[in-house]
Every structure is written in structure tokens, then in C-alpha cells.
Amino acid sequence: MDSIHGHYHIQLSNYSAGENLQSATLTEGVIGAHRVKVETALSHSNRQKKLSATIKHNQSSRSMLDRKLTSDGKANQRSSFTFSMIMYRMIHFVLSTRVPAVRESVANYGGNINFKFAQTKGAFLHQIIKHSDTASGVCEALCAHWIWSHAQGQSLFDQLYVGGRKGKFQIDTLYSIKQLQIDGCKADVDQDEVTLDWFKKKGISERMIERHCLLRPVDVTGTTESEGPDQLLNAILDTHGIGYGYKKIYLSGQMSAHAIAAYVNEKSGVTFFDPNFGEFHFSDKEKFRKWFTNSFWENSMYHYPLGVGQRFSVLTFDSKEV
């Protein structure tokens, strides 16, 4: 700035007084213009530096993963952007508006909220929206991991979050959830079979009962469109005389599908997990039935045939740990 002003001031000494006055006015304007340009350039440069510093600060101090790579050296899964990601984000937003109503209703029917979780919003949505095969949701994989964790006497959320509190994700668990969903979405594979294979490796097996002199897995299917959730609830709450059981529940409709899970115990009640709303506990089956029928089924919007309110399938599982 000073060197520019000095340069033009020296040139003025070669002119007469009259010319100097005219030139001085012109020069002052030129100097002013240059000063504005320089100040603008410096201001822009400073803004860029501040923005860059802020981004770096946020990336370092607000990283959502406990470390960059999994224990076996794998990075968090990502894929190229697709426009379907925008559509899924909108669907997640609509579902997320139902979270308050569902959670508030739990206490009204004698239940407790064990953990507030929703794949439809917040930091977890930010993680799954990064890959085209997980952007629509990872309910199947979440339910599988929830059953496995519960069967070990542990909490999925202690394994998913550092310290069991929302904040940083433990990348090993996050990666495992996403990868199970990705594997189930591959062409020429059956997602149910992928999950069953994963369960077997974890010591979780389908419950088998004898039918016509043959052992068959307990797989109850039915409809909910006109009958409501009664048949569905009967299948969820039936422990087949054993007194307990893990349930993986599949709901489907005209345009969508969803998985939820439960652990039913004749003595301790029902622990219910929905990836869209969290983990809830009811001390007995009747409280759970009333809540599910009178509140949850509508508040979740699962009763709409256009969504997931047409058909259901309930699989029962046992664990070596139980």
C-alpha cells in the first residue's frame, strides 16, 4: 500500500502546478482504486484462511469416529453420490417427525426407554447416507447386531458408541453394521440368507420345531392391512412353550419394508428395538401388546399399506448364550 502510494507521488513531481493538481486528483482516484482492490484481495485471502482453519478444526475436533480405520485396516464405507440419497434423506426426515410421539407414548403404557436411537436423523444418518446401499436405512443389519449384542448380555449401543454415549462411533461396530447391510443388497443374493449366515457365525440359530415329523424353522407370516397388528403380535409374543426367544420381525407394504426386533421373556417381559425409534422395555407382554396396538402401530405410521402395513414375517432365534 505504501509503496504504491509512493510510486505515484514521485511521478507527480515532473508536472507543473496546474497539471499537478489535475494529476493529483486522478492519481488519488487510481490510488484509491488500487487500495480497494488490495484491501479486497487481502480480506478475501483472510476469509479463505479462516474458513480453511475452521474446517480443519472441525474435522479434527469433531470427528465422529474413534479412529480412521477398523482393527483390520478397513475404512468407513462410502460410495459415489446418487440422487436417490436425496430422496432417502427426505423419507428419513418424514419418519423422524414421528419419533417424539412414539417415545412419549411408552411411559403411558407402563414401559421404559432403554436407549434413544434413530437411524432417521442425526449423526448415524450422516454415516449411512454416505453409501448408496445403506442410504435407505440399515434396519436389517441393526436388528441382527442388536439380537447378537443382547444375547451376549451386552448393549448394542455400548458397542456402537464410545463409552456407550452418543458422540463418537466405534468404527469396528459401525463398519460391521454397514457391511452386513451392503452384503445383503448385492445382486443375486437373498438378504435373509446373508443375515442367517452371519447369525450362525455368531452362535445365533433359528428356533426349530417339529412339524410332520420334521424339524422346521419357526417362521410365521401373515397380513396386517385389514386385520391390524393382532396376528403380528401373536407371532411376536409366542415363545412356543420355551419361555423366551429372540424375534426378527419383517414388515412390508406397497413401496417399502422395515425390520424390527424383540426379546420376549415370560418372566421379565418384552424388550423391543426399532431402528427408527430406539430400545424400549415393558415388564409384561400385556403392557407391550396394548402399547403396540393402541399407540405404536399408528404413531409409527407403519399401519399405512403404502408403507409397511400389508404383510409381516416373524422369525424366532435362540442363542448359545441364553
From Swiss-Prot:
Subcellular location field: Secreted
Q: Which GO terms describe its cellular component?
A: extracellular region
> Which SUPFAM superfamilies does the UniProt record give?
Cysteine proteinases
Q: Pfam families given for it?
A: Peptidase_C58
A GO BP entry: proteolysis
Q: Where is the active site?
A: 139, 258, 274
Asked if the keyword Secreted belongs to this entry, the reply reads yes
Spans annotated as Disordered:
43-72
Query: EC number(s) per UniProt?
Result: 3.4.22.-
Q: Which NCBIfam families does this one have?
A: yopT_cys_prot
Subunit description: Interacts with human ARHA.
| Known role | Cysteine protease, which is translocated into infected cells and plays a central role in pathogenesis by cleaving the C-terminus end of the human small GTPase RhoA/ARHA, a regulator of cytoskeleton. Once cleaved, ARHA loses its lipid modification, and is released from the cell membrane, leading to the subsequent disruption of actin cytoskeleton of the host cell.
The UniProt entry's sequence similarity note says: Belongs to the peptidase C58 family.
Protein name, UniProt field: Cysteine protease YopT
Which gene is annotated as encoding this protein in its UniProt record? yopT
